[in-house]
Amino acid sequence: TDEYKHKLDEATAAAAINELGLPLDFQTATKKVKESYATYRDGLEIFAREYGIPHKDLYISYHNYKKKLVSTIKPYDGLLEKLQTINCPQYVFSTSSKDICEQILKHIGLYDFFKGRFYSVEDFNVYKKNESSEVYQKVCEQINTKPEDCIFIDDSYSNLDFAKQIGMGTIRIYYKNNSTKDMKFIDKAYKGIYECIDGLKKDYGC
């Protein structure tokens, strides 16, 4: 949700100041995170470019703070039951650490549901987000499925671009207004997870 995204921005800013020792106040650091997303599609990238911090160090410090947010996530009522009605195998691919992602999946009651789970760092040694489409190709190879037979779903449009580059179908979930109407690498956009599930059935026959 937008509220959770705001918390992630603040966690990124706090990590930059408290763990990496950057000479910034909290407001300035948070502003830089938002600027980084807008410019590089990655909230950490600006700190790598302006302060020379390795992406691995940025990744680790950010996830140290992200751990504190897991308990604040509110599970969607009946989401597991809704996902079980989709007639196709479903996988998780995340740029978050395996530890945090699995904590989140357990917290929201979906840990045992997905057919497989893949993590950009632990499985593919990729610390920097949105650098190439290679990691998406590797996920398709792992599940032995052609990209054109996959649908990649995300609420972050920046993750959808590279998925589309290798031929995957792409769906964006948004929460308030669809701000990506003119982005050609997004096939469909649905408001919220429930509308997305309904759309998968209606528009894709899942």
Give a label for each model feature.
Residues 1-77, 99:
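N-terminal helical cap/lid subdomain that shapes the substrate entry/recognition surface
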Residues 91, 97-151:
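Substrate-recognition "cap/lid" segment bordering the active-site pocket of phosphatases
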Residues 147-190:
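Acidic, Mg2+-coordinating phosphoryl-transfer loop and its flanking beta/alpha structural elements
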